[in-house]
Amino acid sequence: MEEMTPAVAMTLSLAANTMCESSPVEITQLKNVTDAADLLSDSENQSFCNGGTECTMEDVSELEEVGEQDLLKTLSDTRSGSSNVFDEDDVLSVVEDNSAVISEGLLVVDAGSELSLSNTAMEIDNGRVLATAIIVGESSIEQVPTAEVLIAGVNQDTNTSEVVIRLPDENSNHLVKGRSVYELDCIPLWGTVSIQGNRSEMEDAFAVSPHFLKLPIKMLMGDHEGMSPSLTHLTGHFFGVYDGHGGHKVADYCRDRLHFALAEEIERIKDELCKRNTGEGRQVQWDKVFTSCFLTVDGEIEGKIGRAVVGSSDKVLEAVASETVGSTAVVALVCSSHIVVSNCGDSRAVLFRGKEAMPLSVDHKPDREDEYARIENAGGKVIQWQGARVFGVLAMSRSIGDRYLKPYVIPEPEVTFMPRSREDECLILASDGLWDVMNNQEVCEIARRRILMWHKKNGAPPLAERGKGIDPACQAAADYLSMLALQKGSKDNISIIVIDLKAQRKFKTRT
C-alpha cells in the first residue's frame, strides 16, 4: 500500500460578518509560505512593508510637510462659507430642486514532533481570528518546506473550519513549487472624505461596505488546478464614489442601492457556476455582472424596473428623480486575490503599484475617440461648450440617470479585472473634483507619503483596533488630498476614498 502523506489539522473560529449571515463559513485565504525565511526573521530586523518595499525611519523623515498650514487655512475658509461662483459644471441645463489585520505569528515544528492544536491557537477577539499560521519542517529557516492546501472545509456542527496542510515527503530532496495558497483575509484599511467645496449644493455621495459579500472563487481564479472544492469563496469589500449632476437624488440612490444590486447579481451567477461550467473568461463574467447591475439600478431610477420602498412590501414603478438628474459611478470590489473596478462616467479609480500609478478606469468623455464615434453613430452630437459636451450639455458620455440624453449617454460601465500584487500600495477612488486639479501619479505618491507619515508619528495601532471602522492613516491621506485639491483651485464637490493595500507596515530604525 502506498504510504499516505502526513497531514496537520488546525481548527479556527471565524466570524461570519457578511451580509449573508446564513452562508457557510470557510477559510478564505492562507498565507503563501514560500517566503518563510523572510516571515520568520526577527521583527526588529524586518524591513518589510508587506509587499517587498523597505521602509526606514530616515525615509519617512524626509517626507515633506510644506503647505499644511496653508491647506488648513484654505479648508477653514471654505467650510466657513463657500463662494457661490459660477464654474464649469458637468451640466449646463435644468437643475432639480440631494482587515482585522492578521499578524504573521508563525510556529516552526520539527518534522518528527507531535502537534497540539491548543498550543498553536492564537488569541481571538470577538470571534475574529487575529493570528494563526503553522509551518511544519526543519528548524532551520532555510529548510522550511512549502505547505500546500488540500482541504479547507467547514464543520457544520461547531461552526469551525478545518484546514489540512499536506507536507512534502520527508525523504524529498526538493520543495514543492508553483502552488498558490491564500492567507486569511485582512480587513481593508480605508479613509474617506466628501466635501462640498466651492459649490452651492452637495451632489457627491460615497459608499463603503467592508466584508460585504462572499465572492465565488471561480469568478476570481477559474477552475484552478489543484484547488480543493472546499475552498469556494473569498470575502469581498465594496467601495464606491458617485458624482451627481443636476441634483443629488441619483447619486444618493446609487449610494444606497448599487452594492445590493451587485450582490443580487453575484448571487445569481453563483447559482449558474454551481450548475454548469459557463466556459466564459472571468473578465467576460465580470463585464456581464456589473453591466447587469448598473442597468438594473438605472432602470429603477428611471421607473422602468420596480424598486423597493420603505414601509411597503410591494415594488413601485416610479422615477427616483427628474430626467435631467444623473450621476457617475466608480466602484471597486477588493479581495485578497483581485481588485475589480467598474466605472461609468468621469470619476476615477487609480492603483499605486510599486512606484507607478495605474489607472483602473478610463474617463468617459464625449471627445474620447471611441465615445465620440458611438454618440455620432447613435445620432447624437458632441458640441464644444466650455469643453466637449453631449449636445452642448453633459460633460460625460456615460452616466446613470440622465433619461433626456438617452441613447447617446448610456449607463453601461467598463470593467477592469486586476490580480493583486505584492507591490500594491494603495487604491484611490475619487470624483473629478480631485482629478481635475491633480494627476494620477501625484495623488498616489501623496497618499502613500501621508500614510507613512502618520505611522511614523503615531506608530502602529493595536492589532485588535485595526480594521474596525476608518483607518486613521488612510483618513489623514484622504483629508490632505481634499485640502490640497482646494488649494489648487478645485471648484467642484470632492469625494475621495483611500484604501491602504498593505496589511501591515513595519519600520526598521537605524542606529
Swiss-Prot record:
Cofactor: Mg(2+); Mn(2+)
Binding site for Mn(2+) 2: 243, 432, 492
Tissues showing expression: Expressed in seeds, roots, stems, leaves and flowers, especially in meristematic tissues, guard cells, embryo and siliques.
GO biological process terms held by the UniProt record: abscisic acid-activated signaling pathway
Transport among keywords: no
Residues given in the record as Mn(2+) 1 binding sites: 243-244
Gene3D superfamilies reported for this sequence: PPM-type phosphatase domain
Pfam families linked to this entry: PP2C
Quaternary organization: Interacts with SWI3B (via N-terminus). Interacts with ABA-bounded PYR1, PYL1, PYL2, PYL3, PYL4, PYL5, PYL6, PYL8 and PYL9, and with free PYL2, PYL3, PYL4, PYL10 and PYL13.
Gene: HAB1
Activity modulation notes: Repressed by PYR/PYL/RCAR ABA receptors in an ABA-dependent manner.
Main location: cytoplasm
Function comment: Key component and repressor of the abscisic acid (ABA) signaling pathway that regulates numerous ABA responses, such as stomatal closure, seed germination and inhibition of vegetative growth. Confers enhanced sensitivity to drought.
Residues carrying the site annotation Lock: 385
UniProt name for this protein: Protein phosphatase 2C 16
Domain topic, free-text comment: The 'lock' site stabilizes the complex made of PP2C, ABA and PYR/PYL/RCAR receptor by keeping receptor 'gate' and 'latch' loops in closed positions.
One Gene Ontology molecular-function label: metal ion binding
Cofactor binding, per record: Binds 2 magnesium or manganese ions per subunit.
